[in-house]
Amino acid sequence: MTQSFEHLSVLLTETVAGLNIREDGIYIDGTFGRGGHSRKVLEQLGPNGRLIAIDRDPQAILAAEQFKDDSRFQIVHGGFGQLAQYVEELGLKGKIDGVLLDFGVSSPQLDDAERGFSFLRDGPLDMRMDNSQGQTAAQWIARAEIEDMAWVFKTYGEEKNSRHIARCIAADREKTPFLRTKELADLIARITKNKERNKHPATRVFQAIRIYINSELEQIDQALEGALTVLAPEGRLSVISFHSLEDRMVKRFIRRHSQGESVPHGLPITEAEINKSRKLKGIGKAIKPSAEEIERNARARSSVLRIGERLPYDLESV
């Protein structure tokens, strides 16, 4: 029997409102998950609207069956980093009215011990978003050099004790390979001296391994750049981040494309020419969940929503 896990979409109302839904518009939900954001978009679309959802998790593809009778909806099995490719294959490049991206790990993924994402539930050390392909976390840990592990923990988890943890993992795996989440989490908890308040010592390392195994930051970079190529003029980009690495990427991306290309001082160039290189404008300030939402869903606590709007200046080259 398949166990079901509840998932509450974070910043649901704010994120969909940021898309400025048109009844006959075409929208992308690049991170379908369990369909919370997609459902909200479909509620606001008219009969001629269209929603294309994307997810690389086979369980998410199964969850999309809930919309199988809605002709406005279709699901693509793949990574959100390839959204521009999928849109181009559909002949919709430059015609998308909104792109929604939610970079969080869904509650069903965290709560299902068999997926191997959680340090609070014992399960196989997997962590793959698409568990039908690619190396598992256990396979990577078994082969990775100490220097490589330390780099991953520091770069993707901002873990201060990265080298110490990497050395301890390498020493322990010589005796017994790490195959279960609890084995790795218990080791990290045991060797960590300066513990952060209200945070499990393994939090940063598990985050780092997950990001590395799934090439998450590369996927984010590709998705953001891809959104620029598929959005129609005045099309919206709504992006939810869950940790500082992701949010910095989104913030810098919107800022860079809002300012246009940098021009050497003294170069004779008009403001109109500079504006031609601007591709986005930021919409409002970063949005964080309300106290009420955090009380309902503690996993929303670290989420940040940023919204951008596609400018038309260079669309003649799209």
Curated annotation (Swiss-Prot):
- Keyword set includes Electron transport: no
Q: Main EC class of this protein?
A: transferase
Highest rank taxon of the organism: Bacteria
Question: Its GO CC terms?
Answer: cytoplasm
E.C. code: 2.1.1.199
Q: Which UniProt keywords apply?
A: Cytoplasm, Methyltransferase, rRNA processing, S-adenosyl-L-methionine, Transferase
Catalysed reaction equations from the record: cytidine(1402) in 16S rRNA + S-adenosyl-L-methionine = N(4)-methylcytidine(1402) in 16S rRNA + S-adenosyl-L-homocysteine + H(+)
The UniProt record gives the binding positions of S-adenosyl-L-methionine as G35, G36, H37, D55, F80, D102, Q109
Among the GO biological process terms of this entry, one is: rRNA base methylation
Molecular functions (GO terms): rRNA (cytosine-N4-)-methyltransferase activity
- Cross-referenced Gene3D superfamilies, in alphabetical order? Putative methyltransferase TM0872, insert domain, Vaccinia Virus protein VP39
Q: Where in the cell is it found?
A: Cytoplasm
**Task performed by this protein:** Specifically methylates the N4 position of cytidine in position 1402 (C1402) of 16S rRNA.
NCBIfam families reported for this sequence:
16S rRNA (cytosine(1402)-N(4))-methyltransferase RsmH
Q: Hey, which family's this protein in?
A: Belongs to the methyltransferase superfamily. RsmH family.
| PANTHER family (UniProt xref) | 12S RRNA N4-METHYLCYTIDINE METHYLTRANSFERASE (PTHR11265:SF0), S-ADENOSYL-METHYLTRANSFERASE MRAW (PTHR11265)
The protein's name is Ribosomal RNA small subunit methyltransferase H
Q: Which organism is it from?
A: Shewanella piezotolerans (strain WP3 / JCM 13877)
Q: Which gene encodes it?
A: rsmH
